[in-house]
Amino acid sequence: MNIDSFKYLLSEIFFIDLKDERGAFKKNVDYPVLIKDMRNIVKENKEDIDVKLFLKAMPIVLVLDNNFKHKEAYEEVIKTVKDFDKFLLHEALNEDADLDIRLIYAYYLKENYDDINYVYLYISLLEEKYKDKAIDEAIEIFENIYLNNKEAKYALYKLGYYYRFKKDYIRSKAYFEKYLKLENELEKKEEVEGVLSLDYEEYKIELAEYFIGVKKFKEAYDILIQNIDNAKDDRVFYYLSVVMTMTGNFKEALDYAIEASKDRQSAQYMDQLAISNYNSGNLDSAIAILEKQMKKEDYTPSTKEYLEKMKEQRDMMNK
């Protein structure tokens, strides 16, 4: 979270110099009150300020202005308040309050109290404010939690879903499987098992992509070829074509490329179809495929390079 983006809240605070000492509250110290709370005091014609209003504003100043001159005085006051964290938790959970202020409260609790529930509250409010943009910070926090506690079920559960959202199905599956080993609640287990079942095809594709990237073509082939007769995803055929190309099985590569491109004529797929035709001796067909993609202005950075090299070869053959 970018703390600086919340500093505008300092302009919504009014500072009061108490005339007399009030317990831990000292003279000659500027104590903060939210302007909206100050307005209510004036509106209701109150002479005294409830110390709770000071306590509500102090964490905002402490979080947003680390060099504030009365920082130590504020911290001393907070130390004297029994269960101050519970008081602030109540404010952070108040759905009628400003979300940014609630988030600052949660941040303060997370940073100053050793309670995992305050971390969870902070992440919850972070997600409420930033939606999907909060995921990277949430992942970092939950991964640190898991590193320090291998039985942190909730962290594993959330990490499984976060990586699923990012379409990183390998990590998602790994975290979900660790979670399942720890979870005893049947309903939760069934939920996660259902998600893993839905994501199996994506996991398989991603794992195959990984093996292709590290040139482990046999491992990629073994994953892709499983249940090939029931394959509903054209990416299975596309990556099988890539594997066959890389292992020199050009006839099979062409067969898979044709199958992959039946329902999807994307630039990536058509490049592979052209390469497979070229490797199978169908130079004219390969050129025709790439020329068609160029005319459609739907091509990859490599399409033009492939086309130029193939045309050069055809020209040399025709001389």
Where in this protein do the model-derived segments appear?
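Generic helix N-cap/helix-start motif at coil->alpha-helix transitions
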Residues: 50, 80-89, 113-119, 149-156, ...
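Solenoid-like repeat scaffolds
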Residues: 78, 107-114, 142-151, 180-182, ...
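Alpha-helical adaptor scaffolds
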Residues: 120-136, 205-263, 267-268
